[in-house]
Every structure is written in C-alpha cells, then in structure tokens.
Amino acid sequence: MTSIRATTAVFAALVLITTSTGTAAASTDPHREAVQRQLTAAVASGAAGVQIRVTRDGRQFTARAGVAKLGSPQSVPLNGRFRVGSITKTFATTVTLQLVGEGRIGLDDPVSRHLPGLLPDGDRITVRNLLQHTSGLHNYTDDIPRDPKEFLPRRFDHHTALGTVRKAAAKPLLFPVGTKSSYSNTNFLVVQLLIEKVTGRSWRAEAHRRILGPLRLTDTEVPGDNPFILGPHARGYLVVEGKPVDVSALNPSMAGAAGEIISTTADLDRFHLALLEGRLLAPAQQAELTRTTAVSPGYGLGYFKMTSSCGITLWGHTGGIPGYLSVMLSSANGSHRLESSLTTGTALDQQVLTKVVDSAVCG
C-alpha cells in the first residue's frame, strides 16, 4: 500500500478478505479451528495483526492473530479499538434515515433544498443519490497523494467537510446524476453537512444522541480532530521505502462522516444487530436501507450486499483508512455476523483472505 488512496484501493479489491481476519482461543470446535488456520495464514501473508468476532446461530467467539505492535510480543487486544473507515457510512446513513422518518428531510429532496449553492448540480442530486453513490460527484480521496512520503507529513492536517466538498464539487460530474454508480467519499461529506444543517448540531453530536448513547456504545467514538486512538488498540502501518511506519495517529477530520469513527468488534456487533432488528429505524426507512436498483445492484443506502461461497447473502460495510482495514457483515436475519479489523502496511494475498471470510461465515 502506498497511501490512504492505496489503502482504500487495496481494501476495495479485498472486500471479502478482511471479513475473516482474527484468531480463536484453543478449541476443539472445528469452526473456530478453521478460522484460526486462516488467520494464521493472513498474518503469514503480510498482516501485522487481526482480530475478529464471529456469531453463528447464537454462538459467538472472538479470535486474533499477529501482534499489536511490530517488534513487540504483545498480542492484538481481543476487543481493542480501531479505525473503522467506511463503516462510518452506515452510521451516517442511519442518522439520515432517522431524520427522514421524522419528516425533517426527504430521500428524494434535492441537496439544494437544504444546502443551496453548495453543489453546481445540487438541484438534480438528491439525498438518495448521495447515500447510494449515484450522484456522480468526484471522489475527493482520489486527490490524496499516492506516495506515503507525501501523505505522512500531512496526516495531522485539519480538514473541514465544507472545504473538501467545495473542492470536489468544482470538478465535473463523472456521469449524469443517477445514471451510474461510482463510490465517492464526497457523497458522505455532503451527508454530514445535511445532517448538521437540518438538526443545527454537529454530525458527531447527532451520532452520539441517536446511536452511540442509546445503544451504550461506550468504546465507539466520533473523534473529529483528535488524532489518537484512546484505549487498547493495535498499531496500523503504511510502508514507506520498504519499511512499515506507524500511522495509528492521524487527524480523522479528513474522513468525517465518510470514515472517521473508532470502534470495537463488540460495539460494531451491537450496532449492527440493533440495525438488523429494526431498533434504529422505522419500517419504511428500514426497507429503504436495503433497496437496490439496476444502476446500483449491490449497494442500498450506505449498506452493501455480497454473497459468500456457501451462498449466504451478507449485508454490511467494509472500511479502509491508513493502517486499518475493517469489516462488518451479517446475514439478513442476523444469524451469521462478523466484525473484524486488520492492521497492515502491505498488500495481502486475496485468496488467503477470501478463505478467512469463508471460514468465518461458512465454517
């Protein structure tokens, strides 16, 4: 990997693989043993450390492999904190859909209704287009330096959602609004601005008020400008001139509602189960969450689906931010769930990681 952009690119190519990184305690359970074997293989293929939480048919276990810090014998904390990257989008979508249910914003409202003048095409781009990645907006993370030597000295810079969106919106649309799908982090910075405009409070405050507080996600944080991961955590790395460099500390304001959240596998599992069980959204908005279209067949609203090798359809999100790859996936009924974090500074073997996912989901 060569930068935040490269991190995202690698993760996109390995969507399923991250799903299964973790280790299990010694056990005669064949499922746990299968997961452990694949975790060991993931570390052998380049991961510094991995942790995973797996739930299947009411039985749950946690597992890990590798180390929390290169050069140290310390194991990855089993419920250590990590940067979840784009899993943040599912949190932001949940807040937005709650506002839709309250009648404060509409999915088919044009952005210009709430944020006049922000986007040149704001009369045509709707809230739904943003959540579905069909807006055509330029992806601002494509402009982040590819070379980690350029990224490293900038990683503590402060960024505002408004400033970042304005720069991205100055570039031409990738396609006419609604005609195609293209993943763009810019969409969710606009979502952040919408949440703040409609509520009069920060996106951070709304996430705490609506999700983190009610669900008691005490190990989950919307950090803003705080560059540090508080509490036990594994270090994340980028490779610079062939050597891993610790990038655990960085200013997550560059990610905002597109990817700034810090959490744990336990908190992500609690959040995802609440979402699946309809405890966070009204039925109408719950249905919208997983509604796909011909233009965006694999992505609902801040939420995507994939199919495991054993035919189980999974919903959730993955995330990539410098130093960390993460995953949160579940079957529609919640019987099969997994949350995982992987720390690495190298490209990993896709087949190895795909096997990890399959071991966790299919066993």
Name each region found by the language model.
Residues 57, 68-70, 135-136, 227, ...:
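Solvent-exposed coil/turn segments that connect beta secondary-structure elements
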Residues 31, 35, 84, 88, ...:
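Hydrophobic (often cysteine-bearing) scaffold residues that line and stabilize catalytic clefts
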Residues 55-77, 81:
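N-terminal, post-signal-peptide region of Sec/Tat-exported proteins
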Residues 1-27:
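Secretory targeting and sorting signals
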Residues 46, 71-129, 175-184, 256-259:
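Short active-site loop at a secondary-structure junction
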Residues 2-4, 25-64, 199, 245-363:
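Catalytic loop of the DD-peptidase/beta-lactamase superfamily, centered on the K-T-G motif
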Residues 39, 58, 92, 96, ...:
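Residue-level preference for non-acidic, small/hydrophobic
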Residues 122-314, 318:
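Short, surface-exposed loop or secondary-structure junction motifs
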